[in-house]
């Protein structure tokens, strides 16, 4: 896809541009913020960052073939045959999003984009919507923390460390969906992605939105819970007024604000019969859940191969969304719930014939802990052993809450690394331990920063009937330290620990 630079610039907000130095009569072939990804004819956006400054990589970008540099700081030297566009520091990400959107011919306007937001459950809801739409024969694509599908029909693992990619990648991916004939695009819309500070999603046109819940998360980025809430409300406010709608969890404290943010909405609840869709009964088993719900006075009976009432919430959100966008009979969607399966790293049960149970889950917020731990305790026929940590350089206040919740339900707790980043591992662990008051260190509470060693210790302590839960990483393929990332595969580490234990017997 090639464009004339001037043709793109003419469609952008000229107030964002401080000056242009060089020719506008250039052909551009791509957009990126990574000098490593630059190809001949690419526009390079020199983004300022926390650890790295894109301005330090301008020379490399030019060497790799970039002919247009978008920057926000004064240059000491201007290379000939390269065009420089200067914008303000605070608007460079907005400009990058605007530019990418226009370069790729505003792809979201050619799709019906469904945004899913909330603290917990986003990835699962996206995946369930995706599976149900595919089962209905609809051409669908999606972008989530775990998987991508550009409409080619094959799932690929999210290659980026953040849940929501940068705007250059978002619009490129949406453009591929258009080329592949996608009708509906499901987009996991995180608070980071929705925030104007990152501007990753500001040029996406949303047809419908789903709200799962609000909990204690990302306050290190947003500052206050109100800021965090407002960012998510922005998604609902942006939904198309004509045919668009929202799907809202009525059980959440902030549900009324989301209802007020969108013209048309459908609510679901596990507690209130005032919801449009009311779940009146849930019967949980270790590998499946049966539930009943009402809609417009009609009672429906449903069964899913998933564990937990939280998954009933996620399934209801997906069911409502799909039934409404396709104007389908509710029973028809209920019948297709058997196609739903869990995501990688979500309630993964590891069974290699051992006499105890092991579950891996991505849960890493107090909200997720409060939903999962009662379920874990209920299904542990003997002791509950918990292995988890908390992210470094992220919301510090949640650490105490994670410790407090785990303390109530767990018999043994092993604290370890999640992603310490630039923080000291033991400091993070001790922050979590402040919430743990009913355990004794080195008796039923262990501080083991090395996650592999912590998992191996937990497996070695497990007895017949115990349930070991390993939380916080799930599908993630690395552990982030200050100056390095270490490859990680939670499932393999757990399996190897179990196999090693069996060999010792």
From Swiss-Prot:
Protein name (Swiss-Prot/TrEMBL): UDP-N-acetylmuramyl-tripeptide synthetase
Source organism per UniProt: Borreliella afzelii (strain PKo)
Binding site for UDP-N-acetyl-alpha-D-muramoyl-L-alanyl-D-glutamate: 35, 163-164, 190, 200
Keyword Cell wall biogenesis/degradation appears in the UniProt entry: yes
Main location: cytoplasm
Gene Ontology terms describing biological process: cell division; cell wall organization; peptidoglycan biosynthetic process; regulation of cell shape
Binding site for ATP: 118-124
SUPFAM superfamilies reported for this sequence: MurD-like peptide ligases, catalytic domain, MurD-like peptide ligases, peptide-binding domain, MurE/MurF N-terminal domain
């Amino acid at each position: 896809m090639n464009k004339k630079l001037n043709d793109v610039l003419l469609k952008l907000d000229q107030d964002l541009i401080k000056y242009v130095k060089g020719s506008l009569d250039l052909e551009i072939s791509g957009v990126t913020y990574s000098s490593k990804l630059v190809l001949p004819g690419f526009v390079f956006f020199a983004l300022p960052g926390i650890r790295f400054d894109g301005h330090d990589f301008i020379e490399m970008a030019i060497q790799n073939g970039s002919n247009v540099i978008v920057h926000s700081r004064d240059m000491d030297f201007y290379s000939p045959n390269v065009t420089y566009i200067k914008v303000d520091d605070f608007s460079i990400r907005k400009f990058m999003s605007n530019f990418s959107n226009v370069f790729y011919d505003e792809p979201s306007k050619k799709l019906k984009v469904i945004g899913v937001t909330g603290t917990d459950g986003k990835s699962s809801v996206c995946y369930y919507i995706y599976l149900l739409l595919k089962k209905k024969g609809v051409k669908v694509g999606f972008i989530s923390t775990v998987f991508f599908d550009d409409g080619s029909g094959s799932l690929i693992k999210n290659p980026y460390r953040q849940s929501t990619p940068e705007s250059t990648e978002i619009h490129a991916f949406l453009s591929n969906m258009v080329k592949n004939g996608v009708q509906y695009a499901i987009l996991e819309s995180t608070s980071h992605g929705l925030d104007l500070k990152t501007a990753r999603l500001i040029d996406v046109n949303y047809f419908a939105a789903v709200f799962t819940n609000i909990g204690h998360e990302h306050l290190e980025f947003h500052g206050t819970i109100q800021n965090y809430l407002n960012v998510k409300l922005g998604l609902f406010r942006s939904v198309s007024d004509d045919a668009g709608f929202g799907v809202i969890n009525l059980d959440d404290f902030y549900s009324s604000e989301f209802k007020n943010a969108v013209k048309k909405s459908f609510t679901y609840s596990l507690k209130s019969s005032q919801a449009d869709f009311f779940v009146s009964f849930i019967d949980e088993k270790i590998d499946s859940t049966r539930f009943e719900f009402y809609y417009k006075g009609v009672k429906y009976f449903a069964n899913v191969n998933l564990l937990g009432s939280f998954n009933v919430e996620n399934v209801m959100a997906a069911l409502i969304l799909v039934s409404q966008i396709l104007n389908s009979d509710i029973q028809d969607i209920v019948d297709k719930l058997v196609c739903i399966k869990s995501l990688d790293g979500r309630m993964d049960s590891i069974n290699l014939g051992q006499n105890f149970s092991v579950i891996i889950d991505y849960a890493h917020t107090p909200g997720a802990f409060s939903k999962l731990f009662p379920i874990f305790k209920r299904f542990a026929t003997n002791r509950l052993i918990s292995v988890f940590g908390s992210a470094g350089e992220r919301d510090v206040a949640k650490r105490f809450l994670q410790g407090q919740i785990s303390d109530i339900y767990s018999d043994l707790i092993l604290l370890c690394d999640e992603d310490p980043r630039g923080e000291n591992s033991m400091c993070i662990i001790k922050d979590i331990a402040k919430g743990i008051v009913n355990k004794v260190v080195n008796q039923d509470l262990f501080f083991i920063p090395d996650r592999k060693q912590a998992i191996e210790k937990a497996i070695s302590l497990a007895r017949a009937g115990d349930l070991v839960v390993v939380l916080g990483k799930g599908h993630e393929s690395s552990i982030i330290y200050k100056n390095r990332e270490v490859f990680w595969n939670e499932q393999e580490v757990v399996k190897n620990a179990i196999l090693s234990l069996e060999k010792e017997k």
